[in-house]
Amino acid sequence: MKGMEAEHSDIDVSIVIVNYRVKYFLEQTVRSAKEALAGFSGEIIVVDNNSGDDSIEHLRKCFPDVIVIENRENAGFGRANNQGFAIARGKFTLILNPDTIIGSHTLRDCMDFYDKHADDCGGIGVCMLDGNGRFLPESKRAFPT
């Protein structure tokens, strides 16, 4: 999530999703993101890395309010995220993979944490779970100091 450097905006949260050939996962991800945005002003930005399937047509049919960037080549994950960041208007920006379901309370929990720790907080990570509800260790990495 980005915070202090964002320009003033009426949008609370921008969600950036990079897509590559995961049409049905993408649909589920966007549905869960919309549910998580309840109570916030938000926008969802999908950057498609030239999927070559009908991901974007399907997305536009199901979610006409989602902002779409269509790349003519696979720009890679990092560059595609940067394209989404460049147009994001939210006070905070969330990177969300297209095969992720975000809990309906997750954004609220993150914002509550930020509100309590804003002076000491530069970013927020969440606990990730697999499809069976088991903790994914890659959601917590420690660096020795």
Locations of regions flagged by a protein language model:
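N-proximal low-complexity "stem/linker" segments adjacent to membrane-targeting elements
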Residues: 1-35
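Acidic donor-diphosphate engagement hotspot in glycosyltransferases and nucleotidyltransferases
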Residues: 29, 55-56, 81, 105-107
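A conserved acidic beta->alpha catalytic loop
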Residues: 32, 48-57, 73
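Short beta-strand/loop segment that forms part of the nucleotide-sugar
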Residues: 41-50, 69-71
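Glycine-rich, basic loop-to-helix element that forms the pyrophosphate-binding segment
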Residues: 70-88, 109
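Short aromatic/hydrophobic "clamp" motif used to bind/position activated sugar donors
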Residues: 93
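The conserved acidic donor/metal-binding loop of glycosyltransferases
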Residues: 97-101
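Conserved donor NDP-sugar-binding/catalytic core segment of glycosyltransferases
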Residues: 104-138
